Each structure stands twice: as structure tokens, then as C-alpha cells.
A protein has these predicted regions:
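Bacterial N-terminal signal peptides that target proteins for export
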Residues: 2-14
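Bacterial N-terminal signal peptides
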Residues: 11-23
Length: 274
């Protein structure tokens, strides 16, 4: 009488194990989306061993998107993303062709991974300038004239850049043709300060620091919203004259074409005078 019972128990165990495998395989295919509150130019989907970043608005009037797979080191490549660029994380080195990206690296505590920078004259970070002076951070050109030979000699794990949809000014196609992992940031497309700040979540993907990026951004959001509440209560709202400077020359704006600037001024409830 014991044999049928043991046989039934064995069959039950097999059934239970099969259910576990089915459940596990189904869970692996599920994704979660980080809370993107303000940014509108990218989306992120998180899976067990990789994250999918889609840059939905790489430049003004763009008719294409860019997909990136951030795959945890030592794990197999996911299937089903033929056009996506694969970046193994965490990266050990990064080259930045835009000075604005350095703020994200600084807040994440990853400036020590920076090995090359373009437009060093626009860099105010003392840490980065010291690295350039010491030769640990390479200066790889200015504007659209990137020193590709120098950049190749540095051989970073990934290059962060931006694009404008103009072949004479964009460098990402050349970098890709040379086999370099190239991540396009379009934070400049965001029309609000918090939208731009939220791109720290994109930079964090390179270093597997998503949780840290969430914490940093939540703090930025809290402090920013607190300041806007203060400005909303001000009875006297100063006028603003918009302009730019180049050397000893000063230029006043005759019109405001940047949605970012107009949105920022509107948020703090100031009056535009042009």
C-alpha cells in the first residue's frame, strides 16, 4: 500500500516543480517602469538582468528613436531587440562630450570613472580640471571637432554625447562606426528644470545606481518645489532682462525661443521684460 502513495507524492512534487518553473519564467519576462515624473524624452523598462532605455526625442523634429540595453555583467543578452545598442554594466570608464553630463556624474559620485571630456573650457569642476592637468582625463576636442584618434586611444567603455539631427554637428554616427558604445543624452529637449534633472536616472543606468539616482532626484524635487512655493507667495515679482555674453560683448534677446527658459520664468512667477 505504500508504493501508490509514494508514486502519488512523486507525481505531485513534479507538478509543483513544473508550476514553479512556469511562474519563474513568467516573472522573468515581466518588466517594471521606474517612476519618471517630469522627463518626456526617454522611457526606462527594468527587467531582472537588464534595463531597456528608449530615447524618444533625441533632437527637435526627430523622426526616430534610440534604444539601449543595459545588461548586467556576466548575464546573457536578452532576445528581441535587434536595433538596440548593448552596454554592459557597471561601466568602468566613460567619456563625456557635453559638460552638462558632468553634473550627473558628480552627484552619483562617479567622476572617478571619467577618462575623457570635450570642451574643457566650459568645465567648472575643480576635480575634472585637476584630472585634465594631471593627464588622467583626456581633452578630446571642442564643439563638433572631436579628436577621434585621442578618444580611441582612451578607449572608454561608453561615450555620452548629444545630437541635433545635423550631420555636420553630430558625432554619434562616427563613434558608432568606430565600434564605440555611444549613449545620446537629450536632456536639453526637456522644457522644465525637473525634467532635465531627471536625466540623472539615465546616467545611473551605466553604474547600476538606479536606487541612488531616485534618492538624489527625490531630494532635488523636494527642494525645488519648496522654493517655488516660496516664490509664489512673493508680493513683489522682479522683472527679467534676458541676454547672453560672449567675451566682452553683451546681447539682449529680442525673443525667447527656449521653452525651458520661459517655463522656468513662469514657474517662479516672474515677469519677462525683453
Amino acid at each position: 500500500m505504500n508504493r501508490p502513495i509514494r508514486f502519488f507524492s512523486f507525481r505531485l512534487s513534479l507538478t509543483f516543480a513544473a508550476l514553479l518553473l512556469i511562474t519563474a519564467s513568467g516573472a522573468a519576462a515581466q518588466s517594471t517602469a521606474p517612476d519618471i515624473k517630469y522627463a518626456t524624452a526617454f522611457t526606462i523598462q527594468s527587467f531582472d538582468t537588464y534595463r531597456l532605455l528608449t530615447v524618444t526625442r533625441p533632437w527637435r523634429g526627430a523622426d526616430r528613436t534610440f534604444e539601449y540595453l543595459f545588461v548586467k555583467r556576466g548575464t546573457p543578452d536578452p532576445e528581441g531587440y535587434p536595433g538596440a545598442q548593448r552596454i554592459e554594466t557597471p561601466v568602468s570608464s566613460v567619456a563625456s562630450l557635453a559638460a552638462t553630463h558632468l553634473a550627473f556624474l558628480g552627484r552619483l559620485g562617479t567622476l572617478d570613472r571619467l577618462t575623457a571630456i570635450a570642451n574643457p573650457q566650459y568645465v567648472s569642476s575643480e576635480t575634472v580640471q585637476a584630472g585634465i592637468a594631471a593627464g588622467t582625463i583626456a581633452a578630446v576636442g571642442n564643439g563638433p571637432d572631436v579628436d577621434l584618434e585621442e578618444l580611441l586611444s582612451v578607449n572608454p567603455d561608453v561615450v555620452t554625447t548629444f545630437a541635433m539631427g545635423k550631420s555636420t554637428k553630430d558625432d554619434y554616427q562616427q563613434l558608432l562606426s568606430l565600434g564605440m558604445k555611444t549613449l545620446i543624452f537629450s536632456d536639453y529637449m526637456e522644457e522644465t528644470p525637473l525634467g532635465r534633472a531627471e536625466w540623472i536616472k539615465v546616467m545611473a543606468l551605466l553604474f547600476d545606481q538606479e536606487a541612488e539616482a531616485e534618492r538624489i532626484f527625490d531630494d532635488i524635487e523636494r527642494r525645488y518645489l519648496a522654493l517655488t512655493e516660496i516664490s509664489a507667495k512673493l508680493e513683489v515679482k522682479p522683472s527679467v532682462i534676458m541676454g547672453s555674453s560672449s567675451g566682452t560683448s553683451r546681447h539682449l534677446c529680442h525673443q525667447l525661443e527656449s521653452p525651458f527658459i520661459t517655463t522656468e520664468i513662469r514657474i517662479i512667477q516672474q515677469t519677462i521684460r525683453i
